[in-house]
Amino acid sequence: MSNSAMSVVILAAGKGTRMYSDLPKVLHPLAGKPMVQHVIDAAMKLGAKNVHLVYGHGGDLLKNTLTDGALNWVLQAEQLGTGHAMQQAAPHFADDEDVLMLYGDVPLISVDTLQRLMAAKPQGGIGLLTVKLADPSGYGRIVRENDQVVGIVEHKDANEAQRQINEINTGILVANGRDLKRWLGMLNNDNAQGEFYITDIIALAHADGKKIEAVHPSRLSEVEGVNNRLQLSRLERIYQAEQSEKLLLAGVMLLDPARFDLRGELVHGRDISIDANVIIEGTVKLGDRVKIGAGCVLKNCVIGDDCEISPYSVLEDAVLAAECTVGPFARLRPGAELAVGAHVGNFVEMKKARLGKGSKAGHLSYLGDAEIGDDVNIGAGTITCNYDGANKHKTIIGDGVFVGSDTQLVAPVSVGKGSTIAAGTTVTRDIGEDELVLSRVKQVHIQGWQRPVKKK
């Protein structure tokens, strides 16, 4: 089947009562993004011509969160079953296309399994994804005659013999648009739930002489749905275990794979070492021989070769050239940039600031809206005072500057190359090159000073 002649319908109208949340169920995050986004991503990777998202509860929130302009939004005002949901989308189906039906709360479905399902779909028939369970209680059973699928019966409507069947319906199927529209128009709600079941089209297709081909997923977790937070947490751990396995096989050393979370994409070089409880968010790119210490969080960062991030550092939208060292307990906020061999130590925060080649900020400093040259020493307790209560201002420090401890640089201000700022100085005016600047109150000694004594 040609992917150019395919549309996807994603059912996402459920409220998710058992989540006990005001957030629509399909927006609850798995691996850092809404679970329905995983399904949308799979549909896009398949090359679907159209992706129809059927929504109900929390429509405005869904639209504000899922901003991909390629989605076609289909309202299901009343939730009257899966068949009813598909009926709402049916007017959008082309007669000559195949339509793949997915679920927003089944987030781990793989592109590989869906490709096999579409390839297995008989001409004019239905491709159906099924699994076999040791305990199929509660699920719709696959009814076969002479090994051919002839129908699906829901658990509540099944007789005792049918309840012994262990092959169950996952709900995922693909069918021709023209046939699907006709079968959807023939559905009724004459069942124990009083709902329109999409599963009834299997019997309708069989009655039309159409063949139904069943395909099994590569892993059972691919078709596990989410109805409560326990199930969501289970799928999160399954997903993370799979990502850890892929990284290990690709040469990344995860010192404790069970305590690593990938909530985005990790692009990596060779000989990477990542300690326990590290979280990767967004897109993170690591060069060769990078070491990430325990408890670090990296989001949308580029880390050069031979860098070391010590434990409990948080980096977001930061760029590090080669041979940089960061932390422990450092924070690099968006716009932080370190040149080759730069060092940021414990309890140093950077935001929209560049630290030049070989420059160091070792301890307890804030560097915001700053351009810092090469071979600069930033003493402990240095603050770039960048905010005047209304606007942000820039601090520029030239090459080879030595900034003493407990220095405040009140921006906008610039410091010429080679200058020295004495400890405890508040800089309010520009400094030229090779100057010594200090602005302390003269130290006074009073002999025999007696501190006040509390009255008893």
Swiss-Prot record:
Any Pfam family matching the protein: Hexapep
Bound cofactor: record note: Binds 1 Mg(2+) ion per subunit.
Residues where UDP-N-acetyl-alpha-D-glucosamine binds: 11-14, 25, 76, 81-82, 103-105, 140, 154, 169, 227, 333, 351, 366, 377
Pathway: Nucleotide-sugar biosynthesis; UDP-N-acetyl-alpha-D-glucosamine biosynthesis; N-acetyl-alpha-D-glucosamine 1-phosphate from alpha-D-glucosamine 6-phosphate (route II): step 2/2; Nucleotide-sugar biosynthesis; UDP-N-acetyl-alpha-D-glucosamine biosynthesis; UDP-N-acetyl-alpha-D-glucosamine from N-acetyl-alpha-D-glucosamine 1-phosphate: step 1/1; Bacterial outer membrane biogenesis; LPS lipid A biosynthesis
GO biological process terms on file: cell morphogenesis; cell wall organization; lipid A biosynthetic process; peptidoglycan biosynthetic process; regulation of cell shape; UDP-N-acetylglucosamine biosynthetic process
Enzyme class: transferase
EC number, UniProt record: 2.7.7.23, 2.3.1.157
Residues covered by region (Linker): 230-250
Record region (N-acetyltransferase): 251-456
PROSITE patterns: HEXAPEP_TRANSFERASES
Keyword hit for Cell wall biogenesis/degradation: yes
A molecular function (GO) term: magnesium ion binding
Protein keywords: Acyltransferase, Cell shape, Cell wall biogenesis/degradation, Cytoplasm, Magnesium, Metal-binding, Multifunctional enzyme, Nucleotidyltransferase, Peptidoglycan synthesis, Repeat, Transferase
InterPro entries associated with the record: Bifunctional_GlmU, GlmU-like, GlmU_C_LbH, Hexapep, Hexapep_transf_CS, MobA-like_NTP_Trfase, Nucleotide-diphossugar_trans, Trimer_LpxA-like_sf
Region (Pyrophosphorylase): 1-229
Binding site for Mg(2+): D105, N227
Names of the cofactor(s): Mg(2+)
Superkingdom of origin: Bacteria
Binding-site residues for acetyl-CoA, renumbered to this chain: A380, N386, Y387, S405, A423, R440
Reactions accelerated catalytically: alpha-D-glucosamine 1-phosphate + acetyl-CoA = N-acetyl-alpha-D-glucosamine 1-phosphate + CoA + H(+); N-acetyl-alpha-D-glucosamine 1-phosphate + UTP + H(+) = UDP-N-acetyl-alpha-D-glucosamine + diphosphate
Presence of keyword Repeat: yes
PANTHER family according to UniProt: BIFUNCTIONAL PROTEIN GLMU, NUCLEOTIDYL TRANSFERASE
Similarity comment text for this entry: In the N-terminal section; belongs to the N-acetylglucosamine-1-phosphate uridyltransferase family. In the C-terminal section; belongs to the transferase hexapeptide repeat family.
Protein name (Swiss-Prot/TrEMBL): Bifunctional protein GlmU
UniProt organism field: Serratia proteamaculans (strain 568)
